[in-house]
């Protein structure tokens, strides 16, 4: 383990790949052919209006709901059918923006609070742009 307790597997593997994920509810497409590549150790924030599919995508990645089409790969291993607890053991985690957790913080403050965990150098954190 490293100084911040990152599992060996998390340090020495590729990352998360979302390939062509589609999800519909009652014939309405919520996600349409979404693809995304994330490296291990990256902090990611999805920003968008209500109903854009952000939470749906995170729930699919974590295994809380099933996608209609597409693949979720972790370190090149297909995990789309794995239960949530197995994905968690493989190093996946999800921290939703809930008012009960981040009272009084705006979106930018929420993102910077996560960066404090992943980037210890205050000056490097400030150089990261939040859009």
Where do the language-model regions lie?
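Short coil-to-helix segment of the ABC ATPase nucleotide-binding domain corresponding to the Q-loop/switch region
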Residues: 104-112
């Amino acid at each position: 383990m490293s100084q911040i307790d990152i599992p060996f597997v998390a340090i020495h593997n590729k990352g998360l790949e979302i390939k062509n994920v589609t999800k519909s509810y009652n014939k309405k497409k919520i996600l349409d052919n979404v693809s995304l590549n994330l490296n291990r150790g990256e902090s990611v924030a999805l920003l968008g209006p209500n109903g854009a599919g952000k939470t749906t995508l995170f729930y699919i990645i974590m295994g809380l709901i099933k996608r209609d089409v597409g693949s979720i790969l972790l370190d090149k291993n297909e995990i789309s059918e794995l239960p949530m607890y197995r994905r968690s053991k493989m190093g996946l985690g999800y921290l939703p923006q809930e008012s009960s957790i981040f009272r009084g913080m705006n979106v930018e403050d929420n993102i910077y609070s996560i960066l404090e965990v992943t980037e210890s150098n205050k000056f490097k954190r400030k150089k990261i742009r939040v859009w």
